[in-house]
């Protein structure tokens, strides 16, 4: 096997260990650190500010903005079915893919409501990322692509 400088290799679990636990542990450590983490959080802040500004320019209702801003966090309920299902549902609600598709549809269909929902949704994702709440790993809610959060954060350097 050729070894690449700086490459990390995940070894197979040893006999007598739980492969699922080892996989979850490997996933949970895959978060960014240092300057890259700061850059991703600043990108989140820029997304929040940009989408909120676009919403204001678009002339959306601030009551609607306030009412819908936390709707993506209803995806927390997925954790009632366990960490794996919770992570899948949370990540579906906090990925850029669905709101960007909705935004494109809003422009294409000239639908102010659709566009407003997309802008609010993206603003929500942006502020979450700015605050360090990244996409979740199946190891548990506290394990994100931006690092550990909550009580799990104390074990992160």
Describe every region a protein language model picked out.
Residues 2-157:
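N-terminal membrane-targeting hydrophobic helices
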